[in-house]
């Protein structure tokens, strides 16, 4: 299924039904009083978070969503039927933004969470409502209210516990497939991953969700590469796992490239707990691995976990550490 994380839609509440002008007319009551009923209310527009959804694809090809109008009132004081509410299911993590994108109207962060964004119009009043001691046969009614309407943006920010970051071809997708049942596309060239991928890790009777986003390059926060479009999907994560390809040159420069991009995009990303890994260690000798650890760790003042997604070396220890950090946060 195509991954869509942004959509602009028009939503409108249903119109209220008109009130009715009617008079009681029966065989032996030729001049009965007013009995016009009120109109029904228009339907509301309701958003609901659904954990079974992970894309806004349903809003790509349909842009206008209208709730049902209320029915007009009728004689014998019958109130018109209210319009049916329109329920729009969106993935958990969807933000509803104003048309200019400057205001977050609501953030759906839980499964089953509901938000009534627009109320339908109220039904009009029938002539029974206007009967009084000085006006026994009113011919007055009111029309139903027009339902409110607006354009809104839907922005999806995936919910995960752990976000994977790194340069293109750092081994993020291979790592995700090694620790979860996710099956992202894997190939030996940059930008294999074109959309975010989610996977669930099960360890020691616990579980956590991992998000893999397309690789970052210098200038990602300015729109270079694919990172700018997808960095938002790790804004909600609790921990960042930073993967460095041990076979690459300039490891220190590569490390700071990613750190700079995270800082430039969002201070909240910069301040998240970071766990650093060397990937593809199965291609290097123990001497080379140790040499690079001793070279880099003192400079950045961080522990680096050497791992291999191919042989599973170091994976168990890394996952245990991730779980420990998650339990602290």
From Swiss-Prot:
Outline the extent of the Obg domain.
1-159
Q: Where is the OBG-type G domain?
A: 160-327
Q: Which top-rank group of organisms is this from? A: Bacteria
Does Nucleotide-binding appear among the keywords?
yes
Localization, UniProt: Cytoplasm
Q: Which residues bind GTP per the record?
A: 166-173, 191-195, 212-215, 279-282, 308-310
CDD domains referenced in this protein's UniProt entry, alphabetically: Obg (cd01898)
Q: Which residues bind Mg(2+)?
A: 173, 193
- Asked if the Swiss-Prot or TrEMBL record annotates the protein with the keyword Magnesium, the reply is yes
Q: What InterPro entries does UniProt report for this protein, alphabetically?
A: G_OBG, GTP-bd, GTP-bd_Obg/CgtA, GTP1_OBG_dom, GTP1_OBG_dom_sf, OBG_GTPase, P-loop_NTPase
EC number(s) per UniProt? 3.6.5.-
GO terms (molecular function) for this protein are: GTP binding; GTPase activity; magnesium ion binding
Query: Can you list the GO cellular component terms from the UniProt entry?
Result: cytoplasm
Q: Name one GO biological process term.
A: ribosome biogenesis
Swiss-Prot/TrEMBL cofactor(s): Mg(2+)
Q: What is its main location?
A: cytoplasm
Uppermost EC category? hydrolase
HAMAP family assigned: GTPase_Obg
Q: How does it assemble?
A: Monomer.
Entries under PANTHER family matching the protein: DEVELOPMENTALLY REGULATED GTP-BINDING PROTEIN-RELATED (PTHR11702), MITOCHONDRIAL RIBOSOME-ASSOCIATED GTPASE 2 (PTHR11702:SF31)
Protein purpose: An essential GTPase which binds GTP, GDP and possibly (p)ppGpp with moderate affinity, with high nucleotide exchange rates and a fairly low GTP hydrolysis rate. Plays a role in control of the cell cycle, stress response, ribosome biogenesis and in those bacteria that undergo differentiation, in morphogenesis control.
Name this protein carries in UniProt = GTPase Obg
Give the gene symbol.
obg
């Amino acid at each position: 299924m195509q991954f869509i994380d942004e959509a602009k839609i028009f939503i409108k509440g249903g119109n209220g039904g008109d009130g009715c002008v009617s008079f009681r007319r029966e065989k032996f009551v030729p001049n009965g009083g007013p009995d016009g009923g009120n109109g029904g209310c228009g339907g509301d527009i309701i958003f609901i978070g659904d954990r079974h959804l992970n894309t806004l694809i349903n809003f790509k090809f349909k842009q206008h969503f209208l709730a049902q109008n209320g029915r007009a009132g009728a004689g014998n004081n019958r109130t018109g039927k209210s319009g049916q509410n329109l329920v729009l299911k969106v993935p958990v993590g969807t933000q509803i933004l104003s048309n200019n994108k400057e205001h977050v109207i609501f953030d759906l962060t839980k499964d089953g969470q509901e938000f009534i964004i627009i109320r339908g119009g109220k039904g009009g009043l029938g002539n029974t409502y206007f009967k009084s001691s000085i006006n026994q046969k009113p011919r007055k009614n009111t029309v139903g209210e027009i339902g409110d309407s607006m354009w809104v943006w839907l922005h999806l920010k995936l919910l995960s516990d752990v976000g994977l970051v790194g340069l293109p071809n750092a081994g993020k997708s291979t790592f995700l497939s090694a620790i979860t049942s996710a099956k992202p596309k894997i190939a030996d060239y940059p930008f294999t991953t074109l959309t975010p991928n989610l996977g669930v890790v099960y360890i020691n009777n616990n579980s956590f969700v991992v998000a893999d986003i397309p690789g970052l390059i210098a200038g990602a926060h300015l729109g270079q590469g694919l990172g700018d479009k997808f960095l938002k999907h790790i804004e909600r994560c609790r921990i960042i796992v930073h993967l460095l390809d041990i076979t690459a040159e300039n490891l220190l420069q590569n490390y700071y490239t990613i750190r700079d991009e995270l800082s430039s995009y969002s201070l909240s990303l910069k301040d998240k707990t970071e766990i650093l890994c060397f990937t593809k260690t199965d291609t290097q000798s123990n001497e080379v691995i140790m040499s690079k650890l001793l070279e880099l760790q003192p400079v950045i003042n961080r522990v680096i976990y050497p791992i291999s997604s191919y042989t599973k070396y170091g994976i168990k220890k890394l996952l245990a550490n991730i779980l420990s950090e998650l339990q602290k946060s």
